[in-house]
Amino acid sequence: MERYMIHLKNNGYHQVHSSELVHRARELCSDMHASIRVARVASKFLEFDVSVNPDNLGMLIEKLSPIGELDNTRHVVEEKIEKEAGIKDGIFYFNNERFWESHESLEGVWKKCYGKEKELVQGIILLAVAFAHGQKDESNVGIGMLERALEKLGNSPAMYGNIDVDRIRNKIKEMQKSKGLTIFEI
């Protein structure tokens, strides 16, 4: 079996529906050999983290169709990617509410960093993971991660490439104060 992120169009679901969605997906696919790990709810799509034999991927997607129309599918493999491309991908995924994939892309970048840069990238990764928890209706876990994210960002430079780190720090502080996760773009 191989791992995939399946994105279905969101037709009115909210993060509170995450558990219900994963149970429904498991029911719909109960007659096939597949693992539905988790459902994350974004504003425009539902993300299902699944493992299935590649030959059965089409059947799995068809079985999930009562939940929503297919938006896209991504085969999850550890990619060897240049640092700048990893940053670009991480930003793209983050800004499109694909926070788990942002985390994965930025983790590849993190492995190529040293010192303060490594800490800064880890802070952004922790923020992405906090939002991924929010998408599973685990906002309290996500809010708890914000302090670690802020610590990792530390007093790093205001900008990291095209990423406004000062803005991220300020947004994290606002979320800590409000005790809520508020999605924004980086």
Located regions from the model:
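TPR/TPR-like (Sel1-like) alpha-helical repeat modules
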Residues: 138-157
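Extended, well-ordered alpha-helical segments in internal regulatory regions
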Residues: 131-138
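N-terminal alpha-helical interaction modules that lie
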Residues: 1-96, 100, 156-186
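Short, charge-rich amphipathic alpha-helical segments embedded
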Residues: 104-126, 151-160
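Inward-facing hydrophobic residues that define packing positions of alpha-helical scaffold repeats
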Residues: 94, 99, 106-107, 146-147, ...
